Regions:
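Short, conserved phosphate/pyrophosphate- and ester-handling motifs at nucleotide-, phospho-/glycolipid
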Residues: 25
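Short active-site loop/helix that positions an aromatic residue
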Residues: 31-42
């Protein structure tokens, strides 16, 4: 790591009881859930209009960070996923969620030699970069991660074709509303997904799919203004996001084997 290692924070990859790295099934399912939700919003925007109006109204409200917009997200997810009618009185009850029919296993253990320490690099829209004193244990590029995806067809009709189409729409939205605003950033391919805690807020949020590029920037900026702490001088690092045309105004990168790449980008193969 070099001389700076004394001041460097190292974030470890999650490991099983035997010390082997793996990806929790809950993380993979959460990623798929977000992608499927974004797909439904893009394809059926009209049915989300009321929820969108509620979200627009509530974004400016002062709430504890732990509950900020939680009711809004619950409302939006209920529209997309709660279709089982097991509890007709409470549509939002988890027993009505069709994603109960999607079971994702933890990944198979990953060889410890397939971990590499990567420094976090933040790239700005104009291409400027700066690194921060955090190293992450990351899975090496090109490593195959195996997991089992089981769909109970009696509960939901999500199949391979729907998942691939959802991923394609997700990448199109992410490329257009986010990556395109960063000089030199590589677009995601149609079968790419983004996984992991270090990949950034924009890859995990629905606001661009719901509001589009222009209004999505303002919406996400306002969310970050309400949830991210101000700097010591009282300024907020996301205040100028609207003027920059993208929010957040940072894309997460790293350098591995002399090549720069976006954090968390994976190719999804179902077979």
């Amino acid at each position: 790591i070099g001389v700076e290692s004394r001041d460097m924070e190292i974030q470890e990859h999650i490991k099983d009881p035997y010390g082997m790295p793996y990806i929790p099934g809950s993380s993979i399912k959460g990623m798929l859930r977000t992608i499927l939700l974004i797909y439904d919003i893009l394809e059926n925007s009209q049915k989300y209009q009321k929820a969108k109006n509620n979200l627009s109204y509530d974004i400016g409200k002062q709430q504890r960070r732990t509950i900020y917009l939680s009711k809004n997200m619950k409302e939006i997810e209920t529209i997309s996923f709660n279709k089982l009618n097991r509890d007709e009185k409470k549509v939002g009850n988890a027993v009505n969620d069709i994603m109960a029919g999607v079971i994702v296993s933890d990944s198979a253990s990953i060889d410890i030699k397939d971990l590499v320490l990567c420094k976090k690099i933040e790239r700005h829209p104009d291409g400027r970069e700066h690194s921060i004193n955090i190293m992450r244990e990351c899975i090496k590029p090109g490593t195959q991660i195996n997991f089992t995806l089981t769909v109970d067809e009696s509960i939901c009709n999500i199949d391979e074709q729907i998942i691939y189409e959802a991923i394609k729409k997700y990448t199109e939205c992410y490329n257009d509303c986010f990556i395109a605003l960063f000089k030199g950033a590589e677009y995601l391919q149609d079968d790419y997904v983004i996984l992991g805690g270090g990949s950034g807020f924009a890859s995990k949020t629905i606001e661009y799919s719901m509001y589009g590029k222009k209004d999505g920037v303002k919406c996400i900026r306002d969310i970050l203004l309400n949830t991210v702490k101000r700097e010591k001088n009282g300024n907020h690092k996301n205040y100028k996001d609207a003027a920059l045309g993208v929010s957040p105004h940072i894309i997460k990168y790293t350098s591995c084997y002399g090549k720069q790449m976006q954090m968390g980008v994976c190719k999804m193969i179902i077979k």
